[in-house]
Swiss-Prot record:
Effect caused by changing residue 467 to A: Abolishes cell surface localization
Impact upon substituting residue 36 to K: In BVVLS1; loss of localization to cell membrane; loss of riboflavin transport; does not affect protein abundance
Organism annotation: Homo sapiens
Name of protein: Solute carrier family 52, riboflavin transporter, member 3
Residue spans crossing the bilayer: 3-23, 44-64, 72-92, 98-118, 138-158, 221-241, 293-313, 336-356, 360-380, 397-417, 428-448
GO terms (BP aspect): cellular response to heat; flavin adenine dinucleotide biosynthetic process; riboflavin metabolic process; riboflavin transport; sensory perception of sound
Length: 469
């Protein structure tokens, strides 16, 4: 029974951000098909931030009309909308419309808004729902949330999305007549070498290497259908969770009085969740921990500020510059950093399950350590296309390790802060979700002008780099 509950909670948590994470990992294929090209990530950033209207409305309703807000029907609606939108996405993602003297992916952007609305609102609905379950299930939820990034990345890896190769490109004068390809052709242009060399008065063609994306193993249609299956699994998992006995909704900590012996059970209070039910003491005692939940306003302010800061780094600022910081070291280093940093998220959640530490001092120090790794990643992005140790194996190892440790440290902090707030109240988890979205919004708004307006970062073509020794 316990394994089933952990599995259901994990699948439920996976549905929190699986669709938007899927869009990001599919971008290398989408930018080649849609008219926005490489401006598409900028459009996605704006659309996703506009979707924060969802969590804003939920938070305001909770504050002004708490009695009329129930997260269960909202979650069912979100998961249903997300599943249907993914299915529609699979068939309309490449549909364009003529707007303002040009073709634009209006259907893509509108559907992206609905997917982002689902994922953003999940932060202020999924977490409060988890207050109905014992605390140890919250860690499993964060493991599932980490898998929401890992599973789409693995599907994209199997698809071949984002894989590049170096292609030899030959440039010749416009006056050269259109050649007919023969067996002696250049790799990219199909220009016969014999024909070019035979033309009088012509200079030798110039050749250079460029990065080109490899063809995908299956289309975006299949990818989005797989995303819809993941969302449907999340919907089914939540439905089954609702069908479990009500005794699972009562946290063991809510049933036991800290001031009496472990086997003394206090009477149920009016604000306890669900009717009284039997709880297996052997299971409950194994997860019982000494509470260290801070109650003073200064501690709460520190926790919510740290939640917003950590999510600003992990969701808003650093993802915007990952390609700039890694691609200069080559495609292998980039794919290792991108994949392993995603894997580090659920692994850090698992570590927090077996090695929990609720000390705010420890979490603060770990946040500083993760921020230092993030600072190194940001510095390498600013120095692109010629960062430190470019062309040396040590630089590749450092950038991959830095991204993995950045993701792992801050993921652990996020999980433990959620556990601390869960022990306070359901409202604390809702405000935790609001802080998550606020931090992500501020991070994205800060990076958008730096990347797209001021253009402080320069992209690197690893196949054609000219850096000083």
């Amino acid at each position: 029974m316990a394994f089933l509950m952990h599995l259901l909670v994990c699948v439920f948590g996976m549905g929190s951000w699986v669709t938007i994470n899927g869009l990001w990992v599919e971008l290398p294929l989408l930018v080649m098909e849609l008219p926005e090209g490489w401006y598409l990530p900028s459009y996605l950033t704006v659309v996703i931030q506009l979707a924060n209207i969802g969590p804003l409305l939920v938070t305001l309703l909770h504050h002004f009309r708490p009695s009329c807000l129930s997260e269960v029907p909202i979650i069912f609606t979100l998961l249903g909308v997300g599943t249907v939108t993914c299915i529609i996405f699979a068939f309309l993602w490449n549909m364009t419309s003529w707007v303002l003297d040009g073709h634009h992916s209006i259907a893509f952007l509108v559907l992206t808004f609905f997917l982002a609305l689902v994922d953003c609102t999940s932060s202020v609905t999924f977490l409060p729902f988890m207050s109905r379950l014992p605390t140890y299930y919250l860690t499993t939820f964060f493991v599932g949330e980490g898998l929401s990034g890992l599973l789409p990345a693995l599907v994209a890896l199997a698809q071949g999305s984002g894989l590049t190769t170096c292609v030899n490109v030959t440039e010749i004068s416009d006056s050269v007549p259109s050649p007919v390809p023969t067996r002696e052709t250049d790799i990219a242009q199909g220009v016969p070498r014999a024909l070019v060399s035979a033309l009088p008065g012509m200079e030798a063609p110039l050749s250079h290497l460029e990065s080109r994306y490899l063809p995908a193993h299956f289309s975006p249609l299949v990818f989005f259908l797989l995303l819809s299956i993941m969302m449907a699994c999340c919907l089914v998992a939540f439905f089954v969770l609702q069908r479990q006995p009500r005794c699972w909704e009562a946290s063991v900590e809510d049933l036991l009085n800290d001031q009496v012996t472990l086997h003394s059970i206090r009477p149920r209070e009016e604000n306890d969740l669900g009717p009284a039910g039997t709880v297996d003491s052997s299971q409950g005692q194994g997860y019982l921990e000494e509470k260290a939940a801070p109650c003073c306003p200064a501690h709460l302010a520190f926790i919510y500020t740290l939640v917003a800061f950590v999510n600003a780094l992990t969701n808003g600022m650093l993802p915007s510059v990952q390609t700039y910081s890694c691609l200069s070291y080559g495609p292998v280093a980039y794919h290792l950093a991108a994949t392993l940093s995603i894997v580090a998220n659920p692994l850090a959640s698992l570590v927090s399950m077996f090695l929990p530490n609720r000390s705010l001092l420890f979490l603060g120090v770990l946040s500083v350590l993760g921020t230092c790794f993030g600072g190194y990643n940001m510095a390498m992005a600013v120095m692109s296309p010629c960062p430190l140790l470019q062309g040396h194996w040590g630089g590749e190892v450092l950038i991959v390790a830095s991204w993995v440790l950045f993701s792992g440290c801050l993921s652990y902090v996020k999980v433990m802060l959620g556990v601390v707030l869960r022990d306070l109240s359901r409202s604390a988890l809702l405000w935790c979700g609001a802080a998550v979205q606020l931090g992500s919004l501020l991070g994205a708004l800060l990076m958008f002008p730096l990347v797209n307006v001021l253009r402080l970062f320069s992209s690197a073509d690893f196949c054609n780099l000219h850096c000083p020794a």
